């Protein structure tokens, strides 16, 4: 479970979470990003609101009612949320919104930023096996909207050739994540573990 603790430290570092935050856990807790809302809140002393919603409008109602300062969600939910009118009160409290689980469509990102212009967008990339790998800092979003960003704290991200050597700039290769955030393998499945995990 050390990688979950390392993940909570990493996420709370780059999102700047603190004890006065209120995070909304709208994603399933069985999904690493959903569970991460709990561990990040526990690590930073923040308040976390669990939400089992039926409609996207329920998410907005909870954000307004609970004065949510941080929201992490996946593109399908953000697409639905971006089509709705947001209560103005959400923008008074929401400090950031973070995307995970797939690429955020540019038009969705633009719509969200128009609804909550003071909230910082954090675009994240990662694998379930390795928690998160990278994030694009908010100040880079306009300049490099399609970038996966830089390594999160406690992660080392490399681009390697087939022989295991590091690629040069603009050279294609395999994206490799190593460090404290990477799981040790698949439970009771040494064959799959050997297939996907490599010692570097």
Predicted ranges, named:
Residues 5-22, 30-70, 84:
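Conserved AMP-binding/adenylation subdomain of ANL enzymes
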Residues 136, 149, 168-170, 184-189:
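Active-site glycine/GP-rich loop and adjacent strand/helix microenvironment
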Residues 142-143, 181-200:
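Conserved ANL (AMP-binding/adenylate-forming) active-site segment centered on the GW(Y/F)…HTG consensus within
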């Amino acid at each position: 479970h050390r990688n979950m603790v390392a993940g909570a430290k990493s996420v709370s570092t780059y999102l700047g979470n603190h004890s006065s935050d209120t995070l909304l856990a709208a994603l399933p807790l069985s999904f690493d990003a959903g569970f991460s809302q709990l561990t990040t809140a526990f690590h930073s002393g923040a308040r976390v609101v669990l939400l089992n919603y039926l409609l996207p409008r329920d998410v907005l109602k909870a954000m307004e009612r609970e004065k949510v300062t941080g929201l992490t969600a996946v593109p399908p939910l953000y697409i639905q949320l971006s089509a709705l009118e947001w209560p103005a009160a959400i923008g008074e409290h929401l400090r950031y919104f973070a995307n995970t689980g797939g690429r955020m469509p540019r038009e969705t990102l633009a719509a969200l930023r128009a609804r909550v212009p003071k909230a910082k967008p954090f675009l994240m990339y990662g694998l379930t096996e390795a928690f998160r790998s990278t994030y694009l800092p908010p100040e880079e979003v306009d300049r490099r909207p399609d970038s996966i960003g830089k390594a999160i704290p406690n992660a080392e991200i490399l681009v390697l050739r087939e022989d295991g050597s590091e690629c040069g700039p603009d050279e294609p290769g395999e994206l490799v994540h190593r460090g404290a955030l990477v799981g040790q393998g698949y439970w009771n499945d040494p064959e799959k573990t050997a297939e996907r995990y490599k010692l570097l």
